[in-house]
Amino acid sequence: MNTWLAGLSVELEGTEMIVHHLITATDLEQAESAIMEMGRTWWPALKLEDDRHRWEYPQGVVWFNSIILLEDVENSILRGLKFLDAWTVTGMPDAPLLCDEWGNDWRDITR
């Protein structure tokens, strides 16, 4: 398993912020599919998915903007700081399942 630092931009009521997550997956395809699943399910009522990298909701807009494979030491440092949410991806790229370090499903936390 490898860990990526994934970045998303979130616009909410005219304010844009960057959100980063640590994504642990078997390969880049699985990691990217997990980020796309996060974007699709950020809030409950998806209005529009644009090019599989931008999602529009009544509450705001989410963009997938970066993914970087981390070296082991980088992963260790970022996890040690404890300020980023860490997700482990299982399942197939067309149906990824994301769980945090306590076993909570992404869909249960965001809804």
List each model region and its residues.
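Short amphipathic alpha-helices within nucleic acid-binding modules
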Residues: 29-34
